[in-house]
Amino acid sequence: MPAVLLVLYVNPPPSVCILTQKLSLGLYNQWWRVCRSVPPPWYVFFNKRSMSTFKLMMDGRLVFAMAIAILSVVLSCGTCEKAKRAVRGRQDRPKEFPPPRYNYTILTRYNATALASPFINDQVKNVDLRIVTATRPCEMIALIAKTNIDSILKELAAAQKTYSARLTWFKIMPTCATPIHDVSYMKCNPKLSFAMCDERSDILWQASLITMAAETDDELGLVLAAPAHSASGLYRRVIEIDGRRIYTDFSVTIPSERCPIAFEQNFGNPDRCKTPEQYSRGEVFTRRFLGEFNFPQGEHMTWLKFWFVYDGGNLPVQFYEAQAFARPVPPDNHPGFDSVESEITQNKTDPKPGQADPKPNQPFKWPSIKHLAPRLDEVDEVIEPVTKPPKTSKSNSTFVGISVGLGIAGLVLVGVILYVCLRRKKELKKSAQNGLTRLRSTFKDVKYTQLP
């Protein structure tokens, strides 16, 4: 039994959080059968003629009850953060929420539109690629990149017409793409900022990302709080404005060190990860596998930061735009006007006798566009940087030390109790075999006098 408790303490399953009290009660009842020769606890407190508290502790009942209580507290407080995080919103709330950017009406019918394919068929299309690298585990990162949306909105404003838009984030996998966030906008005024529209659809999120992801203030970027290593890879943002699409790729790298407050993600689930053929046939409806989370952007971001700090994370001072992919610069000897002019000069001057002709400049081979913007076949090949070990928090280390100490103390107490109870039972059995009956010394304190 102590070994089982030790395993549950080191690596408990999610059900431990709910069944901790029942487990403690069950162990208590099972051990009561071994130590049933000892009076129950309430006999001590309600019967003045009971045996002393010291004798009760030696028999093991009170000590065992204290050990079970200590182990229950350790199991429920030290190992159930993930389960408590899902329901703590009802218990803890941020003090203030920012006002919404604008007022809008949510209409569910906009979610009935099939999702366009995130895959790019044009092999020469230039896609903006950004690099996002987390320097340590349990870090909050942002996927931010400026676009040419303002020029499109100016054209629409000059034409004096409203527009409709759709913003979707995808996690690109080797053979499929998983939508993780989707929202549609209708009746938008081009004179205002993007997404400030009168109507919009339900705000859809992948359920496992609600407590670890949120939109930036302009609703164009994505903030990830303490992402796990499984969140590494390629993310693609698709902005569609009146049929025109803008693609932006983010190559995200997360350290392989384990983060205790991170949630592992399964982006390759076939129920959500759709193939290019399914997108082309118009079979992808995000309403079927994404969950609603109709909180305004400011309120959602406030919740995200609150949960992150509650779990022990450190908020960044400011979110910066992701670094653009450094495109290669052509070398000095690439074919151009200078090389053509030098060739003409060389043709006019004859080389000296006995001197070999100089070797012509090798033409520069431009890299394939596939290396500038990773495509479907190599989206998850992310180079992991060499990171320093994460800084350990004093509060976390202190709590872990106290928890381990309490657990060891509880196990020692359980072992002592088991030894005392088994020895007592053995003595009673031996006395019964010898024909001796153990009598309770109820009157052991009565003074005896010799009769005349």
Swiss-Prot record:
UniProt keyword annotation of Glycoprotein present: yes
Q: Where is this region: Disordered?
A: 331-365
Q: What is its main location?
A: virion
Subcellular location per the Swiss-Prot or TrEMBL entry: Virion membrane
GO biological process assignments: entry receptor-mediated virion attachment to host cell; symbiont entry into host cell
Q: Which domain of life is it from?
A: Viruses
Q: Which UniProt keywords apply?
A: Disulfide bond, Glycoprotein, Host-virus interaction, Membrane, Signal, Transmembrane, Transmembrane helix, Viral attachment to host cell, Viral attachment to host entry receptor, Viral envelope protein, Virion, Virus entry into host cell
Sites where a glycan is attached:
103, 111, 347, 396
Q: Which Cys residues form disulphide pairs?
A: 138-259, 176-273, 188-197
| Residues in the Intravirion compartment per record | 423-452
Q: Which residues lie on this side of the membrane: Virion surface?
A: 20-405
Segments traversing the membrane:
406-422
Family assignment from sequence similarity: Belongs to the herpesviridae glycoprotein D family.
What is the recorded function of this protein according to its Swiss-Prot or TrEMBL entry?
A: Envelope glycoprotein that binds to host cell entry receptors, promoting the virus entry into host cells. May trigger fusion with host membrane, by recruiting the fusion machinery composed of gB and gH/gL.
The protein's name in its UniProt record: Envelope glycoprotein D
Q: Which organism is it from?
A: Equine herpesvirus 1 (strain Ab4p)
Gene from which the chain derives = gD
